[in-house]
């Protein structure tokens, strides 16, 4: 028995050592490989899409918020980027047309330069990645149905563990249980079902209404 336990512990230790060794080698590969480090810095594989991708020209709001965003971030270092964008959007709406005019003119100049540099440019928004169906969780109806099926299986098969493993083999069960014991088990289950059904029928609204009518209006 102790030999089996020691061998299991030894196997677990060997597996853990292999995992740690694989993690070290993979991390060394990523850090020593210049291509992989470039992917980590840029946030993905940009070897083919990075050269062909062309950024959109800035509009008037982007020209105005370029300096304002930096200023708000320095004044509020704990503020998140989404909150900064909300504040800048509100401030931009509060500006007058005269205050916005210089930024519109600058945006038109940037767009003209962009058209000259990239005459065949067309804006193509990136599509969001669609999650796989296998990663989705089961709906509530399916999970509740599985729970009900598990309860029914445990009720009608009392000689199985919850984990799905049988307590004994089929041959061992036949040796321990004879036909009379099996009949007694089935009879007790049927009696329980009959008792539950009769109890629910006794306390049903229709039965109570009939009893009340006979009490108030005797024949």
Swiss-Prot record:
Entry GO CC: cytoplasm; nuclear speck; nucleus
DNA-binding region ranges: 54-122
Entry's localization field: Nucleus speckle; Cytoplasm; Nucleus
Keyword Transcription among record annotations: yes
One Pfam family here: HMG_box
Database matches in InterPro entries: HMG_box_dom, HMG_box_dom_sf, SRY, SRY-related_HMG-box_TF-like
Family: Belongs to the SRY family.
PROSITE patterns to which the protein is assigned, alphabetical: HMG_BOX_2
PANTHER family (alphabetical): SEX-DETERMINING REGION Y PROTEIN, SOX TRANSCRIPTION FACTOR
Record-given protein name: Sex-determining region Y protein
Gene: SRY
Any GO molecular function: calmodulin binding
Matches recorded under SUPFAM superfamilies: HMG-box
Primary role: Transcriptional regulator that controls a genetic switch in male development. It is necessary and sufficient for initiating male sex determination by directing the development of supporting cell precursors (pre-Sertoli cells) as Sertoli rather than granulosa cells. Involved in different aspects of gene regulation including promoter activation or repression. Binds to the DNA consensus sequence 5'-[AT]AACAA[AT]-3'. SRY HMG box recognizes DNA by partial intercalation in the minor groove and promotes DNA bending. Also involved in pre-mRNA splicing.
Organism phylogeny: Eukaryota, Metazoa, Chordata, Craniata, Vertebrata
Highest taxon of the lineage: Eukaryota
Subunit structure: Interacts with CALM, EP300, HDAC3, KPNB1, ZNF208 isoform KRAB-O, PARP1, SLC9A3R2 and WT1. The interaction with EP300 modulates its DNA-binding activity. The interaction with KPNB1 is sensitive to dissociation by Ran in the GTP-bound form. Interaction with PARP1 impaired its DNA-binding activity.
Naturally occurring in which organism (per UniProt): Lutra lutra
Signal peptide (UniProt feature, chain positions): none
GO biological process, one term: male sex determination
Record's keyword terms, sorted: Activator, Calmodulin-binding, Cytoplasm, Differentiation, DNA-binding, Nucleus, Sexual differentiation, Transcription, Transcription regulation
